[in-house]
């Protein structure tokens, strides 16, 4: 099901609709055309304002009760009854179902022995080992010796907290400097949807469901609110934000026909609406990216299309029929802005060449298949070779764009998507959705499991090159945690707990060792590293293990 535009309320029934409206799961009923599935789904679930409702609230409630998604219990209200969300399922997989409720503090499934065969033979392994000083690794040293080998800073733009390793330091010592405590935080009255650092790390941009976009000064270790911009033409929430390359403007999108450009330089605000002129009656851009020269804006939308808006010409220059379902994620492959990546609810990542894009012949350079469910986010390593994708199949995959998927891989992924019959926004993850064996034709380099993707389009990213050599992948999680993986081993190296609801977005400072998380509990938290005594760290690990067992 999908709800209409608007903010969530405290009503438990509203809480079951915990995602962007019309952001359908890739699990539509099987048919000959996924494009047809998306159209049919919209016709079935598009709930209009009260004056033209074609779905009665009583019918919706009856459906939820019948499906076991909500239940009535005795309460203290005027009616003596209270509506609460149910997390039991009547189907045969209920005993093995993974409950998506935050209160359960469940543990997402983790690969105890990740398959590293492909990544062990990949070029990214060599890149990371060189970047982290492992290629000339000598004898391991004590922790005290490692501290003495930390290199001094040479530029004012480089943080005193940045992590450096000389060639003879074990790269595993990176883990000793990972963020581990909250140094700053801000709290909103509604859900925080997304947040990102500027390219130089001097500003942090946050978007909330309260329609406010907040700009923070993050220079010299600060986290001070500098400016609040009231977003315009917002439906449901601001869903994505990004800086223009010169950091003088911000872009934001929502359920609207427009992408908005807002100046943040100086005291005045100038809002410019960029009309994408879509054909859909209900339209949304889920993901935004700006080209390196700042001239073009790339957007991925709920109509399955990629949009390119040229700021110099002040018009939409391209509309590419890209996917068979909602496009949830877009990204530029590198600073040339010539290669584009897109990810969709059809479970496919596609690679496009900007120089050959044509509306009348929308052919990707190649396609990457291996996910079993819709893709929620993609992030490029920045070298035009590697990217990662987050998915509703509860995994992240690492891809090499030089290894496209064969036809049988595309067919296997499409079939897997059509077999999904659950809604990630408000249902449990059925056990059958957590299959771990690779699909036929899966060309991914590595798969990472240990985080939850429920309720909304959870995001993941590579850690910065400057401070970590891009050794890690970090992700938000529907359990309210931040999960950090080792790119090369697939193992979870850190879990940061502190939020009371889904962490939708995460952003690592490009030069400092801190991460900012944006959560649906309304909190934005900055996580930094705090040095602790080795014995204290061991005790904390033991306490964490015990807490995990108790849950």
Language model segments and positions:
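Blade-level signature of beta-propeller repeat domains, shared across WD40, Kelch, NHL, RCC1
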Residues: 514-546
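Residue-level recognition of beta-strand termini and adjacent short loop/turns
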Residues: 336, 382-383
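WD40 beta-propeller repeat fold
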Residues: 107-312, 318-322, 329-332, 369, ...
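Acidic, glycine-rich loop-and-beta core segments that form the ion-binding/anion-interacting portion
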Residues: 348-375, 380
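Catalytic lobes of large eukaryotic enzymes
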Residues: 427, 434-439
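Intrinsically disordered terminal extensions that flank WD40 beta-propeller domains
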Residues: 2-190, 198, 537-551
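Flexible, disordered linker segments and immediate boundary regions flanking tandem C2H2 zinc-finger modules
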Residues: 273, 363-364, 406-426, 535-543
